[in-house]
Design a protein with these regions (language model features):
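Positively charged n-region of N-terminal signal peptides that target proteins for export
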Residues: 1-4
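Functional-site microenvironments in short loops/helix caps that host divalent-cation chemistry
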Residues: 82, 86-87, 159-320
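Primarily auto-inhibitory N-terminal propeptides
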Residues: 31-62
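Sec/Tat signal peptide C-region and signal peptidase I cleavage site
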Residues: 25-28
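Active-site microenvironments of metalloenzymes and redox enzymes
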Residues: 30-37, 83-90, 103-218, 264-272, ...
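Mature N-terminal segment immediately following signal peptide/propeptide cleavage
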Residues: 66-83
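Bacterial N-terminal signal peptides
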Residues: 10-22
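Surface-exposed recognition segments
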Residues: 31-35, 94-102, 212, 236-238, ...
Length: 401
């Protein structure tokens, strides 16, 4: 077990106490109509919608405060997914079973994978947070508000490697760790007032399958994959701009191929054996990580063969291998340096019914003492940046563009 630091102890005490004002109203983000963002009172005359108590979930766009960068969220109806793949599916791996049933509540899912345009805004916080003048007074991180703070990713150690195949604002952001992806979702939640997070593995597969049971969301004819995915047969030069292939029946692009996408779950080579029989809720089905390594990514990437882009295909992160060229000690909690990390990205999810403070915290923060120690050690040494997503931050982001 690694040494704990005083700042970590203070953080945990604050976390046990409560959220402070910065995050107290995340569930109350409103549209111009006064309803929650993405909710309309009347049934829309056209376009996708999901009927829920009190209104209708509809697609919506958000502009990241301080920028002109937008992202779209698509409503997905609740339902039940049979997680995993049948024994006779071509290309199946042993970790894709046994199949288990999970009930999914209505959610919004990012129309596309998160882009460099979005993620570079978050990366820019490092410079802002390192400015002691801007981070003074009420904006200074202390033991009482540390629970609301976010860490910003350090500058890339090997940008030429990460961006070898491009850094177009519409290409998917890649090489971030799961911890960094989780912190991004906490940051964008604080900046917009809506509760964003990574999907659970069950939510991801439900969104990818879009009420299908075939190998792909369009069926099992692999010859059709070309129209829906960027994979090794058609994308030798890296990930493509998001949304440039056909969407699945839910209207989501790139659920097959382009880049693998982080989920919140830890990986088990036993697949879904722990879920047993019967229908589980989303929360019951989460396999929270029990070690610092091995988290689940889904969907396949541009470097992968067609069978790895199936709706049920899984892959485990491997920190030691994926950070093989990282010279830092401890290794970066925010970045990977080695393939297949250049085909690993993320996608946002938002629940129709906001999660409890206790549960959303698990989606946002480190979930293992080794990651916690690495982060806090770097911050104490001045090799990390910590700050609060306050309203003033939007103006500084604008100045930093």
């Amino acid at each position: 077990m690694r040494i704990r630091f005083a700042l970590t102890i203070a953080c945990n005490l604050a976390l046990a106490a409560a959220f402070s004002i910065v995050f107290s109203n995340l569930s109350n983000a409103e549209s111009p109509t006064g309803l929650a963002l993405g909710i309309e009172k009347s049934k829309p005359a056209s376009g996708p919608f999901v009927a829920i108590e009190g209104g209708f979930m509809v697609p919506y766009s958000v502009t990241i405060p301080g920028t002109t960068i937008t992202f779209e969220m698509i409503p997905i109806p609740g339902g039940t997914v049979k997680l995993g793949t049948p024994d006779d599916e071509a290309g199946r791996s042993d970790d894709e079973g046994p199949q288990a049933s999970v009930k999914i509540d209505p959610i919004w899912v990012g129309k596309t994978e998160l882009t460099w345009g979005e993620y570079k805004t978050y990366m820019g916080l490092y410079k802002i947070f390192k400015d002691s003048k801007k981070m003074s007074g009420p904006r200074k991180v202390s033991s009482t508000n540390r629970v609301d703070a976010i860490t910003a990713p350090t500058p890339l150690y090997m940008p030429t490697h990460t961006f070898e195949f491009g850094e177009d604002p519409q290409q998917p952001a890649v090489t971030m760790t799961q911890y960094a992806a989780k912190q991004y979702t906490k940051w964008i939640s604080g900046m917009t007032g809506a509760q964003y997070r990574l999907p659970t593995e069950a939510e991801w597969e439900y969104a990818a399958r879009a009420n299908t049971t075939s190998a792909y969301s369009f069926g099992s004819d692999v010859s059709q994959l070309e129209g829906y995915a960027h994979f090794d047969s058609n994308s030798p030069d890296g990930a493509a701009a998001v949304g440039s292939k056909k969407p699945n029946p839910f209207g989501l692009h790139d659920m097959h191929g382009n880049v693998w996408e982080w989920t919140v779950d830890g990986y088990s080579e036993k697949g879904f054996a722990s879920l047993g029989d019967g229908v589980k809720t989303m929360q019951e089905a989460i396999q929270w990580p029990t070690k610092a390594d091995s988290r689940v990514v889904r969907g396949g990437g541009w470097q992968d063969s067609a069978d790895r882009c199936r709706s049920g295909a899984r892959m485990s992160s491997q920190d030691e291998d994926w950070k093989g060229e990282d010279p830092n000690s401890p290794l970066s909690p925010w970045w990977y340096t080695t393939d297949p990390a250049r085909s690993v990205g993320m996608r946002l999810v938002r629940s129709a019914t906001p999660l409890s403070k206790e549960l959303i915290t698990k989606f946002w923060e480190y979930d293992h003492e080794d990651i916690e120690s690495d982060v806090e050690f770097r911050i104490q040494e001045g090799r990390g940046a910590l700050g609060l997503p306050t309203p003033e931050l939007a103006e500084e982001i604008k100045e930093n563009q």
